[in-house]
Amino acid sequence: MSDWNPSLYLHFSAERSRPAVELLARVPLENVEYVADLGCGPDNSTALLQQRWPAARITGIDSSPAMIAEARSALPDCQFVEADIRNWQPVQALDLIFANASLQWLPDHYELFPHLVSLLNPQGVLAVQMPDNWLEPTHVLMREVAWEQNYPDRGREPLAGVHAYYDILSEAGCEVDIWRTTYYHQMPSHQAIIDWVTATGLRPWLQDLTESEQQLFLKRYHQMLEEQYPLQENGQILLAFPRLFIVARRME
């Protein structure tokens, strides 16, 4: 599991794309020339940007070779760069930086967010959506299974929080719009929840395990999910998925 799996990631493409659609709807820009899609993945968010601003010069950034290859195949008119978001530098200042479900993987948001703002033109926008599910059972149970089976903690850190992001971006000279939404995704089974998180949140936990260790981890994780997520009357499972949204406009 050394690289991301685009096919597995896109298995829930509608659910993963919906927050990007809702984030994009809140971006207060009409004329956009230069756009960066940070953590672009296999193209789902970049395609939305291209649909809204077909004449814009859009660059997708991702550290995954597999994701970049998939995106290049799907959107040949856009530029895609394999790079670490923290180190990538645009050729020119940007009108929009769009980051859908990517920045939560990176540390030091107190430094990262002001750095991203510095890459914007005056009146440019940083639009961010991040899963805020560190305290949800899906992610708490990952840590509990790892503790039970004597594996090191490999999960991501919790987000800084609404008030912290507001202060970080306000101090960076931005007008900030910030909100939090909880989605309730209908899952047909507990295995479907595992399929969802295997493409994202579970990756760090599983990637260094042997195949047999992965099977033991997932078996125990499945058992715990059954205890935490009851079936609805129709047999479905409601998976609560909180997400944090930020639209910050550089006012300098």
Swiss-Prot record:
GO terms for biological process: methylation. Its EC number is 2.1.1.144. Keywords: Cytoplasm, Methyltransferase, S-adenosyl-L-methionine, Transferase. It catalyses: trans-aconitate + S-adenosyl-L-methionine = (E)-3-(methoxycarbonyl)pent-2-enedioate + S-adenosyl-L-homocysteine. Pfam families: Methyltransf_25. GO terms for molecular function: trans-aconitate 2-methyltransferase activity. InterPro entries: Methyltransf_25, SAM-dependent_MTases_sf, Trans-aconitate_MeTrfase, Trans_acon_MeTrfase_C. Coiled coil: none annotated. One of its GO terms (cellular component) is cytoplasm. The keyword Glycoprotein does not apply. Its main location: cytoplasm. It comes from the Bacteria. SUPFAM superfamilies: S-adenosyl-L-methionine-dependent methyltransferases (SSF53335). The keyword Methyltransferase applies. CDD domains: AdoMet_MTases. Belongs to the methyltransferase superfamily. Tam family. Catalyzes the S-adenosylmethionine monomethyl esterification of trans-aconitate. PANTHER family: TRANS-ACONITATE 2-METHYLTRANSFERASE (PTHR43861:SF1), TRANS-ACONITATE 2-METHYLTRANSFERASE-RELATED (PTHR43861). This is Trans-aconitate 2-methyltransferase. It comes from Escherichia coli O9:H4 (strain HS).
